[in-house]
């Protein structure tokens, strides 16, 4: 690293006093010296009389520039380094004023619509359908693959990424912001990396790894929901097709094969190297980003747009761990959906009877926590056995998109069944980044976890076409049902016998000589007729 001049150091010091530790990904208009100095990211929408004349579309009533509201409630004890990470209080360590959009308007400059709305005035309801990839027509499958490849090669039209930490963000001369362009798909990868990266504590110190703003906590589902929604919106704009939707991969097959790993879809296994994708697939040409973990952790650098090696994938190939050689079963999903509490203390990867922890895959599908278990989402990732099984790299494998759309479908079904019951989503004391009102890192404009805790068809503009498996009974439940049935049968027989005994007793009383002898003969004849029926019963 080059040493800046004394003047540059002074300049940087003044800026850092204001911003503390910051920098991630922001709108291109905000990656400027002026915006960084002022701490204001409120781009113009349609400036008619010079820069700053239409911040956030103010002239047309679309939005206004306001102070950022960041969650300040306490987080859990898992993160002991308060003040050392630029993601704390997101995004206030970078900008303290952003666009607040009115009504159904949205976007970094209020120039787009909220999810679920469209039209020039954002007053038209929009609903797209996410379907099973295997149910698409041949043309639809081809179009999806082509769209992914296009996103990999198309520069993101709005966002740039930081390539240096706050101390170096202005460059060696103190006057050159260190941001880079990045493709739409690699931006999708980068945001995931940034949410899971370790906290850099300084040169010569080991980076802190027990921090994750998008996994192992209540925000797992809400964070990944917005992550997918952002990619879907970016691809819709890229294709100029608001009806485009991300399909899903129903990984709950219980099989030891990957049914979407074919060359016409996500790529089959290479015949030349079992850890690579077949050269007949377009995805064999993809190169990964954010793989230089050692540099990030020891030098404090950030992932940049440089691409490295190929995607690695070997489904069911981890012979050292038989548990991850087979995908989850359909009944695992059915059982998971019966876990009624969204989350439970300590709101972490060891929570039990937590729907979130169950679908994330740290608990048994019934909700029971077991440190040896990897199920559902986690198991599907580990089954891929390669790039897709490494948290910081996993989105580089495009199967990530399909795996998480299905996980989101399970989440949305749970929200529907339980009326989006947020009572067990903690307001505070969740792992850092996971409180209900926390702005999810590093999305822009700021969006809270609670904003994604809603049913998608009614609030986010998409729905799923999916058939959910019915739950089968476990062996213990079958035994219980059999015992109850047997006891019920005994009870019925006993009740029937009691009734017959009482009936016979009543008949005997009726035979007593309450009348004259001539009527007794009638009774005897009556007995001869009806006694045979009693033996049948």
Curated annotation (Swiss-Prot):
Annotated glycan sites: 96, 104, 181, 304, 350, 385
Keywords, in A-Z order: Albinism, Copper, Disulfide bond, Glycoprotein, Melanin biosynthesis, Membrane, Metal-binding, Monooxygenase, Oxidoreductase, Signal, Transmembrane, Transmembrane helix, Zinc
Enzyme Commission code: 1.14.18.-
Chain sites annotated for binding Zn(2+) B: 377, 381, 404
Post-translational modification note: Glycosylated.
Catalysed conversion reaction: 2 5,6-dihydroxyindole-2-carboxylate + O2 = 2 indole-5,6-quinone-2-carboxylate + 2 H2O
Residues holding Zn(2+) A: 192, 215, 224
EC main group: oxidoreductase
Record has Protease as a keyword: no
Protein's UniProt keywords contain Signal: yes
GO cellular component: cytoplasm; intracellular vesicle; melanosome; melanosome membrane
Cofactor mode of binding and number, as noted: Contains bound zinc ions after heterologous expression in insect cells.
TM helices/strands, residue ranges: 478-501
Known role: Plays a role in melanin biosynthesis. Catalyzes the oxidation of 5,6-dihydroxyindole-2-carboxylic acid (DHICA) into indole-5,6-quinone-2-carboxylic acid. May regulate or influence the type of melanin synthesized. Also to a lower extent, capable of hydroxylating tyrosine and producing melanin.
Protein name: 5,6-dihydroxyindole-2-carboxylic acid oxidase
Lineage: Eukaryota, Metazoa, Chordata, Craniata, Vertebrata
Gene that encodes it: TYRP1
């Amino acid at each position: 690293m080059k040493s800046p001049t004394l003047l540059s150091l002074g300049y940087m010091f003044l800026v850092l006093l204001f911003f503390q530790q910051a920098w991630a990904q922001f709108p291109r208009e905000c990656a400027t010296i002026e915006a960084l100095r002022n701490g204001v990211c409120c781009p113009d929408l349609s400036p008619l009389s010079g820069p700053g004349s239409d911040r956030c579309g103010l002239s047309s009533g679309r939005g206004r520039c306001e102070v950022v509201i960041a969650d300040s409630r306490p987080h859990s004890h898992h993160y002991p380094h308060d003040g050392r990470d630029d993601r704390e209080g997101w995004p206030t360590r970078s900008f303290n004023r952003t666009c607040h959009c009115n009504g159904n308007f949205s976007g970094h400059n209020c120039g787009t619509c909220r999810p679920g709305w469209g039209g020039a005035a954002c007053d038209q309801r929009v609903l797209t359908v996410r379907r099973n990839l295997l149910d698409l027509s041949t043309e639809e499958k081809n179009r999806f693959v082509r769209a992914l490849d296009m996103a990999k090669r198309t520069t993101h039209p709005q966002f740039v990424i930081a390539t240096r930490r706050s101390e170096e963000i202005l460059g060696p001369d103190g006057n050159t912001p260190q941001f880079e362009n990045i493709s739409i798909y690699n931006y999708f990868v980068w945001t995931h990396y940034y949410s899971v990266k370790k906290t850099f504590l300084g040169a010569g110190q080991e980076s802190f790894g027990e921090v994750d703003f998008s996994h192992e906590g209540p925000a797992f589902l809400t964070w990944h929901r917005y992550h997918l929604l952002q990619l879907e919106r970016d691809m819709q704009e890229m294709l100029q097709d608001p009806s485009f939707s991300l399909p899903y991969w129903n990984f709950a097959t219980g099989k030891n094969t990957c049914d979407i790993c074919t060359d016409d879809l996500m790529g089959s296994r290479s015949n030349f190297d079992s850890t690579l994708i077949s050269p007949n697939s377009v995805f064999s040409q993809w190169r990964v980003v954010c793989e230089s973990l050692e540099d990030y952790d020891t030098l404090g650098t950030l992932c940049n747009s440089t691409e490295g090696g190929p995607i690695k994938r070997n489904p069911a190939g981890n012979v050292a761990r038989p548990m991850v050689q087979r995908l989850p079963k359909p009944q695992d999903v059915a059982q998971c959906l019966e876990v009624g509490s969204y989350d439970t203390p300590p709101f972490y990867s060891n929570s039990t009877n937590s729907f979130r922890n169950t679908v994330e895959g740290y608990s048994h599908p019934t909700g029971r926590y077991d440190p040896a278990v990897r199920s559902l989402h986690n198991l599907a990732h580990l089954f891929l056995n390669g790039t897709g099984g490494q948290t910081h790299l996993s989105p580089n494998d495009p199967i990530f998109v399909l795996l998480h759309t299905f996980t989101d479908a399970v989440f949305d079904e749970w929200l529907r069944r339980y009326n989006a019951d947020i009572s067990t989503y903690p307001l505070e004391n969740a792992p850092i980044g996971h409180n209900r009102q926390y702005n999810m890192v590093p999305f822009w404009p700021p969006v809270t976890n609670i904003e994604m805790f809603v049913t998608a068809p009614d609030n986010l503009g998409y729905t799923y076409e999916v058939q959910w498996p019915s739950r089968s009974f476990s062996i213990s439940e079958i035994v219980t049902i059999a015992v109850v049935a047997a006891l019920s049968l005994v009870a019925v027989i006993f009740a029937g016998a009691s009734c017959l005994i009482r009936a016979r007793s009543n008949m005997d009383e009726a035979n007593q000589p309450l009348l004259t002898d001539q009527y007794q003969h009638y009774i005897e004849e009556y007995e001869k007729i009806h006694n045979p029926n009693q033996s049948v019963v």
